[in-house]
Amino acid sequence: MTELTEGNTSKFAKISEKDLSDFLIHYNEAGEGEAVIMLHGGGPGAGGWSNYYRNIGPFVDAGYRVILKDSPGFNKSDVVVMDEQRGLVNARAVKGLMDALGIERAHLVGNSMGGATALNFAIEYPERLGKMILMGPGGLGASHFAPMPMEGIKLLFKLYAEPSYETLRQMIQVFLYDQTNITEELLQGRWEAIQRNPEHLKNFLVSAQRAPLSSWDVSPRLGEIKAKTLVTWGRDDRFVPLDHGLKLVWGIGDARLHVFSQCGHWAQWEKADEFNRLAIDFLRQR
């Protein structure tokens, strides 16, 4: 089998949805079978490939068609300023991409902002969703145990407002539990992505002013979600509080929670092997 790379899996599609008319979406795609769409987080320089390059191969080998989508205003997708909460607009983009690719139903895997996107999709388009896997998702309002916003979110907005290599390093240090995973290669790749799209950074801040994080809260509607859901969390997450995982398993009718020890906000990357086994086993269950 040919090695999967960002280059040989890179594709584009045009979508037309509310506030996303004639909009270009970039994605990486490989494999055949049931569609699994993976949705990245909201940090500066984020994208589908950088978020999920440790996951795409095992999911393809397990028999899935895997799509790593760049959300609107991120990486190679078109720039955008949003007047509504980002999770909802991103969910429309997922639906639009599925329409463009002829995908009737898909499983969703979402980390952080991508988790908020998946939750909104589950509420707005339930008939298009198979199963849902969430890793430290946003969009759940206040915490009972942690002051909000948490340390990582403060650094994220600082990096958007005043991009610097040192602030990026600080954010990644909070992002991950195991500091030995932080290499100059990792930092340099993320920094290059940040510098490549300055409009994305500006537009994220404008969008956040128009629809602040407080508007993202879908907690009151969790009971509407019928999809089987696997919720995962890093015990040491410093971006989104662990007690939000309990909100999800209490609110969603068919949800289970797995907590990774010695793990930060990027469970699918920091605990990739364990996450891949857990997630693929969950998708295979009937």
Curated annotation (Swiss-Prot):
EC number from the UniProt entry: 3.7.1.8
Binding site for substrate: G42, G43, N51, N111, T180, R190, W266
Superkingdom of the source species: Bacteria
GO annotation terms (biological process): biphenyl catabolic process
Pathway terms, separated by semicolons: Xenobiotic degradation; biphenyl degradation; 2-hydroxy-2,4-pentadienoate and benzoate from biphenyl: step 4/4
Site positions for Transition state stabilizer: S112
GO terms under cellular component: membrane
GO molecular function: 2,6-dioxo-6-phenylhexa-3-enoate hydrolase activity; 2-hydroxy-6-oxonona-2,4-dienedioate hydrolase activity
Active site: H265 (proton acceptor)
Reactions performed catalytically: 2,6-dioxo-6-phenylhexa-3-enoate + H2O = 2-oxopent-4-enoate + benzoate + H(+)
Pfam family name, one: Abhydrolase_1
Enzyme class: hydrolase
UniProt entry keywords in alphabetical sequence: Aromatic hydrocarbons catabolism, Hydrolase
SUBUNIT field: Homodimer.
HAMAP family: Biphenyl_BphD (MF_01688)
Function summary: Catalyzes an unusual C-C bond hydrolysis of 2-hydroxy-6-oxo-6-phenylhexa-2,4-dienoic acid (HOPDA) to produce benzoic acid and 2-hydroxy-2,4-pentadienoic acid (HPD).
Similarity remark: Belongs to the AB hydrolase superfamily. BphD family.
Protein name from the UniProt record: 2-hydroxy-6-oxo-6-phenylhexa-2,4-dienoate hydrolase
Organism whose genome encodes this protein: Comamonas testosteroni
